[in-house]
Amino acid sequence: MDPFLLSIILCSWIFVVVSWKKLNCMRRRLPPGPPRWPIFGNLLQLSPLPHKDFARFCTKYGPLVYLRLGTIDAITTDDPEVIREILIRQDEVFASRPRTLAAVHLAYGCGDVALAPLGPNWKRMRRVCMEHLLTTKRLESFAAHRALEAEHLCQFVWAKAQSGKPVNLREVLGAFSMNNVTRMLLGKQYFGLQSAGPGEAMEFMHITHELFWLLGLIYLGDYLPAWRWLDPYGCEKKMREVEKKVDDFHQKIIDEHRKAREAKKSASLDDDNKEDMDFVDVLLSLPGENGKEHMDDVEIKALMQDMIAAATDTSSVTNEWVMAEVIKNPRVLRKIQEELDGVVGRGRMVAESDLGQLTYLRCVVRESFRMHPAGPFLIPHESLKPTTIMGYDIPARTRIFINTHALGRNTRIWDDVDAFRPERHLPASADGGRVEISHLPDFKILPFSAGKRKCPGAPLGVILVLMALARLFHCFDWSPPDGLRPDDIDTQEVYGMTMPKAKPLVAVATPRLPPQMYGRHGKQV
């Protein structure tokens, strides 16, 4: 064909497509939003801290903002009423997930629970979690393991205090969360005297951190398909590398468990006593789909990854933020300890049965979730069909960014947003009931999402957060390292799928209970 004629046809086709899209947009009543560039849309208006850019848009344009991110329609909000509309009233419309490249590479083709689009596979995998892994009975069966890890945590901090050394709280809280999850999931701990070894532990931590960093990226290839051909920063290449490392690690765990089960069968031992089984053993014992004898390894690995990711990094990030804010505000520490002394006393350690009575500590955790949510956004949702919100048209396949960071600092619903004030969450009356850590009907705080996509591991996450904090505040007084005042505690954050402190929290612990309460010696974490 004549090159000139081909050019005319191509230009005409582009003109028709652009004109049709422009006309279609004019017919729709989209929510207000910032002006958009051709091709890129609003992508060029985003900084390395997109949650703050989105909050700025909501301040300027209203509680519901429309964005065009390359080829993708998107909305963002930090308003409780809009969030309730999305997660509860129109849950059936907005409960799906977008198929991002990170989810495809790092979540087994979106075959897990957290990142999978809404559909039969997601329903089945979530049912496996709720009916076999995260039941109340199964979580209670690991209570002794959690108590042991809490004991190890306090003994390690006590040993540091005896030697006069400050405590790196990021390390010890990370080890506490990781050990609790890996004991339940894999039947082993990765830190401590009975650990699987420092090499395997470091490999495990490194893989987890890489995974979270990549999942938190706003990768341009998801919004501009042509970018994938360039990939100048090698993001997709890195995803494939981490994908292989994650898969190899998970496969090794499955092979170890399968080998142990075969050995038990050879020795005529009962390998299906579910009370003594870790999560991987339970998954290996379950039937697969469509009459298969067992679940596929890929399905098992996808669920393993969800459990590890959801219950380790998020709970340790939350605990570090709480510790930072409490050390920065000594009056809050005194009130927490007064409550602990009243509920628990100084003659025994905090037990899980005490956690529901620790009203002020629960308010402290809620206030930390307000100021420092584990992640800047909920995991993005995607609309399954066209709908309306507040009278505005929302197209099908619109990506939804619920800005939890901005929600907690929204001056329309919170006063004195930069002050750490747990008292704002106290019940109106003394008998107002237990303070809930998860979301309340007002949707002002949303640590575990809501609706169909609410985190299935929320009860476990709450226990891990409260238990670590209660033990550390009950057993020790806390202060900044020598030369620093409480006001010097840094609260800068790092953007990602989770938002940890920019610098690890280091503090000095001083025992406040009788010496015999800490055991004979500190154990290594």
UniProtKB/Swiss-Prot annotation:
It holds the Pfam family p450. InterPro entries: Cyt_P450, Cyt_P450_CS, Cyt_P450_E_grp-I, Cyt_P450_sf. It is found in: Membrane. Gene3D superfamilies: Cytochrome P450. Disruption phenotype: Male sterile. Defective in pollen exine and anther epicuticular layer development. GO terms for molecular function: fatty acid in-chain hydroxylase activity; heme binding; iron ion binding; oxidoreductase activity, acting on paired donors, with incorporation or reduction of molecular oxygen, NAD(P)H as one donor, and incorporation of one atom of oxygen. The chain crosses the membrane at residues 3-23. It catalyses: dodecanoate + reduced [NADPH--hemoprotein reductase] + O2 = 7-hydroxydodecanoate + oxidized [NADPH--hemoprotein reductase] + H2O + H(+). It is a single-pass membrane protein. The keyword Iron applies. PROSITE patterns: CYTOCHROME_P450. Heme binds at residue 455. Belongs to the cytochrome P450 family. Involved in pollen exine and anther epicuticular layer development. Catalyzes the in-chain hydroxylation of lauric acid (C12:0) preferentially on position 7, generating 7-hydroxylated lauric acid. Does not possess activity with other fatty acids (C14:0, C16:0, C16:1, and C18:0). Participates in a conserved pathway of in-chain hydroxylation of lauric acid required for anther cuticle and pollen exine formation. Directly regulated by TDR, a known regulator of tapetum programmed cell death (PCD) and pollen exine formation. This is Cytochrome P450 703A2. It comes from Oryza sativa subsp. japonica. The gene is CYP703A3.
